[in-house]
Amino acid sequence: MARLTGLSAAALATDREGIALRYAKAWNAVVVLKGARTVVASPDGRVCVNPTGNPGLARGGSGDVLAGMLAALLACGLPAYQAAACAVYLHGAAADRAAAKRGEYGMLPHDILPELGALFAENQR
């Protein structure tokens, strides 16, 4: 996000929700500002802060898993904001489950996938 906006990481940290919303409106796009408590903002003013996830998601490759999840939800026909909010939530929840088994710093991005399947299975009832 720092590269896209020209803002420093420190500046981005000062008002994550406000900055995500400002750029969602400016770019007319849903913005996902990853980090501790990832922010999802839409051009129409909706903002959510994700309660799931842990520092293990800072590992390279976890964003690729999130991107794949988001693409899959979009392909299923969910509107962009809902798809982003769902993908971010499920990604973090699956990572929390993986961290409970392997530790936040022991988990790898591929550990998220089986936990995602377990989340779907539990909530499909």
Where are these regions (language model features)?
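Charged C-terminal helix
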Residues: 93-125
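Short beta-alpha connecting loops at secondary-structure transitions
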Residues: 2-6, 50-57, 67, 71, ...
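N-terminal loops that bind phosphate or other acidic moieties
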Residues: 3, 13, 45, 57, ...
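Feature representing long, continuous alpha-helical segments
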Residues: 18-21, 48, 67-68, 81, ...
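Short, small-residue alpha-helix embedded
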Residues: 2-3, 59-90
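Glycine-rich phosphate/dinucleotide-binding loop and adjoining beta-alpha-beta core of small-molecule
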Residues: 1-52
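Active-site proximal loops enriched in glycine and acidic residues that flank catalytic Cys/His/Asp
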Residues: 33-35, 42, 51-52, 61-63, ...
